[in-house]
């Protein structure tokens, strides 16, 4: 993904303040609530029957944290997202059969959650930089599908 030096600075500056545990669970939880068809990939997570059940689900929180830790790895390797996410792309494509469109959805939900958490600090410039990053990550995760 091509980011200017300023965009990289905006992304990494904000990311240093992100509580990965909290934001990861919230982002994955919101994905499962806003786009309920994504729940079919999480059959083993137990009760996802209501928004409260989803947001309180320990497995959703744990997997959300795992997802954001991987996203953090991507932020450290912005010039090689395909390489960084190659194994995860293979796993999600070959074993889990996740629709790659879901990666875009999760990226957009993550942007919403960051905006919610950071308010005025999440300026349009910060959002624009994050939109580039989440699109790049989604593309890298979908790479095995092409």
Curated annotation (Swiss-Prot):
GO biological process: hydrogen peroxide catabolic process
Modified residues (N-acetylvaline): 1
Keyword Transmembrane: no
Record-listed heme b binding positions: 63, 92
GO cellular component: blood microparticle; haptoglobin-hemoglobin complex; hemoglobin complex
UniProt KW Translocase keyword: no
Annotated ranges, domain Globin: 2-146
Keyword terms, alphabetized: Acetylation, Heme, Iron, Metal-binding, Oxygen transport, Phosphoprotein, S-nitrosylation, Transport
Record InterPro entries: Globin, Globin-like_sf, Globin/Proto, Hemoglobin_b, Hemoglobin_oxygen_transport
Positions carrying S-nitrosocysteine: 93
Pfam families, A to Z: Globin (PF00042)
Protein origin, superkingdom: Eukaryota
Modified residues (N6-acetyllysine): 59, 82, 144
Residues with the Phosphoserine modification: 44
GO molecular function: haptoglobin binding; heme binding; hemoglobin alpha binding; metal ion binding; organic acid binding; oxygen binding; oxygen carrier activity; peroxidase activity
Modification sites for Phosphothreonine: 12
Annotated tissue distribution: Red blood cells.
Family: Belongs to the globin family.
Subunit structure comment from the entry: Heterotetramer of two alpha chains and two beta chains.
Function, as annotated: Involved in oxygen transport from the lung to the various peripheral tissues.
Protein name: Hemoglobin subunit beta
Species annotation: Vulpes vulpes (Red fox)
Taxonomic path: Eukaryota, Metazoa, Chordata, Craniata, Vertebrata
């Amino acid at each position: 993904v091509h980011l200017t030096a300023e965009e990289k600075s905006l992304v990494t500056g904000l990311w240093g303040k992100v509580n990965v545990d909290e934001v990861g669970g919230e982002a994955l939880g919101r994905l499962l609530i806003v786009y309920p068809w994504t729940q079919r990939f999480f059959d083993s997570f137990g009760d996802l029957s209501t928004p409260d059940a989803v947001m309180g689900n320990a497995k959703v929180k744990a997997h959300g944290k795992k997802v954001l830790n991987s996203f953090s790895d991507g932020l450290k390797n912005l010039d090689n997202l395909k390489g960084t996410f190659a194994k995860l792309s293979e796993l999600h494509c070959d074993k889990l059969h996740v629709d790659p469109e879901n990666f875009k959805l999760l990226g957009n939900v993550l942007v919403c959650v960051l905006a919610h958490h950071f308010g005025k600090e999440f300026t349009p410039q910060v959002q624009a930089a994050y939109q580039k990053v989440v699109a790049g990550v989604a593309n890298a995760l979908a790479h095995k599908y092409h």
